[in-house]
Amino acid sequence: MSRVAKAPVNIPAGVEVKLNGQLLTVKGKNGELSREIHNAVEVNQDANALTFVPRTGVANADAQAGTARALVNAMVIGVTEGFTKKLQLVGVGYRAQMKGNVVALSLGYSHPIEHTLPAGVTGECPSQTEIVLKSADKQLIGQVAADIRAYRRPEPYKGKGVRYSDEVVRTKEAKKK
């Protein structure tokens, strides 16, 4: 059995968990998240904990149990604390600003880029070179941050581009004559 799946997911006070067949719904102060759990995994709900048991006779049940536990744990953390992703814009003239739920980016192209944030993700720009994204859904916020970063990934010679705030960009040395 997966080591990750052996640990139960603790349900803190103020979080409501509903299990309807294989559909798990987690509700908390930051919203409500739902996820379909793989058929190879059996979910047991106690008073304040969820346990994930792989079904016997299914090939990848152990792996699916560990994955399901990790995803549900992220859901519980998301509805209680939420997730934050910070992006930095490095480069001359690179700017960002929020217009409602649209991030307007100026990244050195001939046109401005407008990225609409999906429902469930909020954004703010504390400065012109910073973007802070917040959401209860870990997968969604990671995808939105990756989409924004993909407009101008950090290049390896000067390090210009959109990067995560904790990302370390390894720069190369320029070609010598």
Curated annotation (Swiss-Prot):
To which protein family does this belong? Belongs to the universal ribosomal protein uL6 family.
Assembly and interaction partners: Part of the 50S ribosomal subunit.
Quote the cellular component terms of the Gene Ontology held in the record: cytosolic large ribosomal subunit
Question: Which GO biological process annotations does it have?
Answer: cytoplasmic translation
Concerning HAMAP family, the annotation shows: Ribosomal_uL6_B
Please give the name of this protein.
Large ribosomal subunit protein uL6
> From what superkingdom does this record's organism come?
Bacteria
Which species? Answer: Actinobacillus pleuropneumoniae serotype 5b (strain L20)
Q: Which InterPro entries match?
A: Ribosomal_uL6-like, Ribosomal_uL6-like_a/b-dom_sf, Ribosomal_uL6_a/b-dom, Ribosomal_uL6_bac-type, Ribosomal_uL6_CS
Please provide, alphabetically and separated by semicolons, the GO molecular function terms listed in this UniProt record. rRNA binding; structural constituent of ribosome
State its role: This protein binds to the 23S rRNA, and is important in its secondary structure. It is located near the subunit interface in the base of the L7/L12 stalk, and near the tRNA binding site of the peptidyltransferase center.
Name the keywords, alphabetized.
Ribonucleoprotein, Ribosomal protein, RNA-binding, rRNA-binding
